[in-house]
């Protein structure tokens, strides 16, 4: 069985050599293939602002991003200044995701944008709050509430800030293994397919 905590000396030396020389195979998504709902001069790629860097900037400047700081991960019945808030959770997810992505030579800006936006639509009180809101929403509207799908509503509806399809898809699918018990990526090639997928998530839990 593979040991993912310790790499062989040969592989470690190879990775170190590739890192120092900059000569390694890039397996990450190519920025030039990012899709957006509308063409915008503000999205032009420059040497210091690759495509997904625009998404990072737009997410952290979205008014709802500030709400991370006031949402706790759990509901506490006692005063606790050190209780974890969603802002710290998002920072940790971003850091861990970038570490893993860097080892795999993936697109780190794409990874960071997904990580920073992945809980934008989350309720307070962690998944218990989400479950309760889903029950209320479905009882009154016949539709389901899912925090990852609500994150899409925030970034693509409430604030239509032209986030790329690749980032939105990553946010929408970030907890698919919880709902489905497994996650098999399905490539998306258009916003039409993406919108149909999002609508199906409201109707089918």
How should each PLM-predicted stretch be described?
Residues 112-117, 121:
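Short alpha-helix carrying the canonical HExxH Zn2+-binding catalytic motif
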Residues 111-112, 197:
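A generic hydrophobic-helix recognition signal that picks specific residues
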Residues 48, 82-90, 121-122, 140-144:
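Short secondary-structure transition/capping motifs
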Residues 2-44, 61-66, 95, 103, ...:
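Sequence-structural signature of the catalytic-core scaffold of metal-dependent phosphohydrolases
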Residues 74-77, 111, 151, 169:
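Residue-level signal for alpha-helical context at structural boundaries
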Residues 79-110:
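Alpha-helical phosphate/pyrophosphate-handling elements in metalloenzyme active cores
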Residues 70-75, 106-111, 128-131:
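Short amphipathic alpha-helical segments, especially helix-boundary/capping motifs
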Residues 40-47, 51-60, 66-88, 197:
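Active-site flanking loop/helix segments enriched in acidic
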């Amino acid at each position: 069985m593979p040991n993912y905590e310790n790499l062989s000396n040969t592989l470690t030396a190879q990775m170190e050599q590739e890192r120092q020389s900059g000569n390694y195979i890039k397996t990450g998504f190519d920025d030039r293939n990012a899709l957006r709902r509308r063409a915008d001069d503000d999205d032009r790629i420059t040497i210091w602002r690759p495509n997904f860097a625009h998404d990072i900037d737009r997410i952290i400047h979205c008014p709802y991003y500030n709400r991370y700081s006031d949402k706790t991960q759990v509901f506490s019945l006692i005063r606790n200044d050190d209780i974890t808030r969603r802002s710290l959770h998002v920072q940790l997810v971003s850091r861990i995701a970038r570490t893993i992505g860097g080892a795999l030579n993936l697109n780190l800006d794409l990874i960071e944008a997904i990580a920073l936006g992945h809980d934008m639509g989350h309720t307070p009180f962690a998944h218990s709050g989400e479950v309760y809101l889903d029950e209320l929403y479905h009882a009154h509207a016949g539709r389901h509430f899912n925090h990852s799908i609500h994150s899409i509503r925030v970034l693509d509806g409430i604030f239509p800030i032209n986030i790329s399809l690749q980032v939105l898809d990553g946010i929408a699918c970030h907890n698919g293994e919880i709902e489905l018990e497994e996650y098999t990526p399905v490539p998306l090639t258009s916003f039409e397919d993406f919108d149909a997928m999002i609508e199906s998530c409201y109707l089918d839990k």
